Structure formats: structure tokens, C-alpha cells
Regions:
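Internal anion-binding site segments
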Residues: 180-184, 190
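A generic "binding-loop/recognition-motif" signal
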Residues: 129, 183, 203
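Active-site-proximal beta-strand elements of phosphoester/diester hydrolases
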Residues: 215-219
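N-terminal beta1-alpha1 cap of cysteine-dependent amidohydrolase-like domains
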Residues: 1-126, 139-142, 146-173, 188-195, ...
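Gly/Ala-rich beta-loop-alpha elbow adjacent to hydrolase catalytic centers
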Residues: 125, 129, 134
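Active-site phosphate/pyrophosphate-handling residues
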Residues: 111, 131, 185
């Protein structure tokens, strides 16, 4: 029995050593509350895209010991989810345009971005994660695309995006291509240092930082099995692999 235990311990240590050689990606979740329970979830599409690249995702939840967890991560993925509290960018929600606000998630995203920018850790933002690049730094969002009369034509859940800057990720993607549409809010103002890569008429659809390893898309590339989606996630992996943490 003791021999079996020693063998098991050895296997466990070897597995841990192998896994620690892989790059770890901290992933934010969605929080869903019912009358009887709170659910923390991440859609499998996000996980599948990361593991396909041999990256190791770990879910970071509100209340986590960030001083312990964040230094473990070689990159961060801020996923889609609820709307940010407009108080973050000095606006109110009198018209109830921002929905299902979760202050705990707002704080978590802000803490992660502050850590990542300070330590130059790669970040990819998707949908809400794209809007995080503004809201978490006090820059405004359009709380509702329709009520702000933004031109944002789409056919069902799909629309076309057009390149406006041939920078970074933009150099690897075509001038125009079709993406999905699952959002009712959009970026209004960006912090200094961000370059707009793609737009759909009035709506900013993809951005990248000039000097920090940060990219973000308003659409959901993890939900699309296209060459463009593969390029985006491969580019994120390249940012991670090239980063000297």
C-alpha cells in the first residue's frame, strides 16, 4: 500500500510539473443568481478555444485571493456578460438601459486589468471584455445602441466589420469579414494608447493597445468556427508566448 501511495505521489508531482510548464490563462466567469442559488459559469466555447492552443484556463471568481491567483497567470481572458455599472464612467442609469449590473464582477474585471497593465500581462477581452477596456478605466460606453441612434446594421445575429487601422492584429486579418452580434452596448470613449482596428459604421468592434499586449473584440470569436476566429486566438497566444513575464 505504501508503495502504491509513493507511486501515486510521484505521478502527481510529475503531472504538476508538466502542467506548470504550460501557460495559465485566468478567465473571468458569468454570475447568475436565482432565488435559491448563485451560479458561476464559463461557456465551454471559451475553454475549448484556449485548450486547443494548449493553454490552461483557470476561472477567477469574485472573492478570490487575487494576490495569490493573479501572479500565477500568464494571460487573462475577460469574457462576455452583464452590463457595467455606468457609475464607473460617471453616468447614471435613470433610463434603465444598463441591465443586470453586478458590482462584484465590475470590481474583479477592474482589479485584473489594473494588475495586467501594471505588469504588462497579455489580456484578451470579448464583448463585455471589450467594453471593459473603457468602463474599467472610467471611459464612457453607449448604454444602448438603439436609443443612441448609432448606425449598426446587421442581418439577424451577423454583421460585417471593416478595418480602419492596419495595426497589430489588423495586419493578420482581412479588410472586411462577417462577425456575430450579441451586444446592445458599445464603446464610446477609449483610454489613451488604444488603436481602433475594426468598426461597423458607428460602432467600434475591435481594438488593440499600442504598447501593452491587450486586444479586444466586441463580437464573440469563440462562437465562430472561422479562419478569422482562429487568427484572433492564435494572435492572443503569440502575445502570451512572446511576453517575458
Amino acid at each position: 500500500m505504501e508503495q502504491i501511495k509513493r507511486k501515486y505521489d510521484k505521478i502527481l508531482v510529475v503531472n504538476l510539473e508538466v502542467n506548470m510548464k504550460k501557460k495559465i490563462i485566468g478567465v473571468t466567469p458569468r454570475i447568475n443568481k436565482t432565488d435559491s442559488a448563485t451560479f458561476v459559469r464559463v461557456h465551454r466555447n471559451y475553454i475549448d478555444k484556449l485548450t486547443k492552443l494548449d493553454l490552461v484556463p483557470i476561472i477567477i471568481t469574485p472573492g478570490s485571493d487575487l494576490n495569490t491567483v493573479l501572479p500565477l497567470c500568464d494571460g487573462f481572458l475577460i469574457i462576455g456578460g452583464d452590463d457595467y455599472d455606468p457609475v464607473m464612467y460617471n453616468e447614471n442609469n435613470d433610463q434603465n438601459e444598463s441591465k443586470e449590473i453586478n458590482p462584484d464582477m465590475d470590481k474583479l474585471d477592474t482589479d485584473i486589468l489594473n494588475y495586467a497593465t501594471k505588469n504588462k500581462i497579455p489580456v484578451m477581452g470579448i464583448c463585455r471584455g471589450h467594453q471593459a477596456m473603457s468602463a474599467c478605466f472610467g471611459k464612457a460606453l453607449y448604454q444602448d445602441i438603439e436609443s443612441n441612434h448609432l448606425e449598426h446594421p446587421h442581418d439577424g445575429i451577423y454583421h460585417e466589420v471593416t478595418k480602419v487601422n492596419n495595426f497589430g492584429l489588423g495586419k493578420e486579418l482581412p479588410d472586411k469579414f462577417i462577425t456575430n452580434t450579441y451586444h446592445h452596448q458599445a464603446t464610446k470613449d477609449l483610454p489613451d494608447g488604444f488603436v481602433v482596428l475594426y468598426k461597423n459604421h458607428d460602432v467600434i468592434e475591435a481594438i488593440e493597445h499600442e504598447t501593452l499586449p491587450i486586444i479586444a473584440t466586441q463580437w464573440h470569436p469563440e462562437r465562430m468556427d472561422t479562419k478569422e476566429s482562429d487568427i484572433i486566438f492564435n494572435y492572443f497566444e503569440k502575445l502570451i508566448m512572446n511576453n517575458s513575464k
